[in-house]
């Protein structure tokens, strides 16, 4: 009998459902919320309401594209955290009702682990390389910046992490200061491709070990803009592509410096990147350069698997299903969860 997992993701502002059959992805439907753009960030109450409106049609579409009926499902995997509590509750509540009505198991998935395991998503007939355990994963998003030692799908160790702001958060805030809009990541990425990454210099943190810090960079960027704009009120408009390129290059250098140290310290040459910031062109290029220079075997996810999606939840749920690792229907959502 086939194992068919429905995955649900609702941790922030994307409602997503995916179906995996015997380890192969059949469908992955994502509904993003444009309502937040006018506010320059995600509004939790609006996100929760949008999830309530989207989750039923998204699940229906995922099952339809997969050619699967709900009665064929083996289990429901869902994001339990971390994330916005109101958003998480929509997915968790739907999963509970859905699983109970079908009398099938529930599988809780840590959103961060889902990002790491996105490298194991594959469609039938698709040729894609997957990392071998153990491997290193640079997990970078709006809320997290971590270097993770992945020993197994259910055995991960954080080697280093941000002590303040995440890389994605720093990018978004600097973008907002420049008046570029939200979300800042894709905007900075697009502008940076046209600019000179060495045009401006911003401070880099001196943090011991493998931990990160981005609050100092954010402050340096803000104060530099303030000083430059005293002489030229239109400084940002005149230099925005170079500002974006220099900011991106600084953040990528900070991320890769610690990752190099981790790879050398733990003697690992299989290195992956995951999370929303892994879509950044500068970071992806730096990974390729490191692969050539240091002999790394690198793993860069498809763009569709960098942002929040249910495919990563479904594949994690599939691995847990094989181990019969189910959760109680009473399990609550958790807004704060670590690896």
Predicted features and spans:
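Glycine-rich phosphate-binding loop plus the immediately following alpha-helix
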Residues: 151-194, 219, 223-229
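Conserved phosphate-binding catalytic cores of ATP/NTP-utilizing and phosphoryl-transfer enzymes
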Residues: 1-2, 109-135, 316
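N-terminal beta-alpha supersecondary unit
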Residues: 2-82
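Short Gly/Thr/Asp-enriched flexible loops that form oxyanion-binding sites at enzyme active sites
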Residues: 78-102, 121-122, 281-290
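Short beta-strand scaffold segments in enzyme catalytic cores
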Residues: 15-20, 137-139, 145-149
């Amino acid at each position: 009998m086939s194992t068919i997992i429905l995955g649900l993701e609702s941790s922030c502002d994307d409602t997503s459902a995916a179906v995996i059959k015997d380890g192969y992805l059949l469908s992955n439907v994502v509904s993003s919320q444009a309502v937040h753009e006018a506010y320059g960030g995600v509004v939790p109450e609006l996100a929760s309401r949008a999830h309530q409106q989207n989750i039923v049609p998204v699940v229906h579409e995922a099952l339809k594209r997969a050619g699967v009926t709900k009665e064929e499902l083996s289990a429901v995997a869902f994001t339990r955290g971390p994330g916005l509590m109101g958003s998480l509750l929509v997915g968790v509540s739907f999963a509970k009702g859905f699983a109970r009505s079908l009398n099938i198991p529930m599988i809780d998935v840590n959103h961060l682990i889902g990002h790491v395991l996105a490298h194991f998503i594959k469609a039938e007939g698709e040729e894609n390389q997957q990392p071998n355990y153990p491997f290193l994963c640079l997990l970078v998003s709006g809320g997290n910046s971590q270097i993770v030692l992945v020993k197994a799908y259910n055995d991960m160790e954080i080697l280093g992490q941000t002590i303040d702001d995440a890389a994605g958060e720093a990018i978004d805030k600097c973008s907002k200061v420049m008046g570029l809009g939200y979300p800042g990541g894709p905007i900075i990425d697009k502008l940076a491709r046209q600019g000179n990454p060495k045009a401006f210099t911003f401070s880099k943190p001196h943090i011991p070990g493998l931990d990160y810090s981005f609050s100092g960079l954010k402050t340096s960027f803000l104060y530099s803009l303030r000083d430059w704009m005293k002489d030229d009120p239109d400084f940002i408009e005149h230099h925005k592509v170079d500002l974006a390129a220099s900011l991106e290059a600084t953040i990528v250098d900070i991320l890769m410096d610690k990752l190099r140290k981790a790879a050398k310290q733990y003697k690992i040459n299989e290195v992956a990147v995951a999370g929303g910031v892994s879509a950044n062109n500068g970071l992806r290029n730096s990974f390729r350069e490191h692969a050539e220079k240091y002999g790394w075997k690198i793993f860069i996810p498809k763009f569709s698997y960098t942002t929040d999606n249910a495919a990563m939840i479904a594949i994690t749920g599939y691995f847990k299903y094989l181990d019969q690792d189910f959760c109680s229907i009473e399990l609550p959502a958790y807004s704060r969860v670590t690896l």
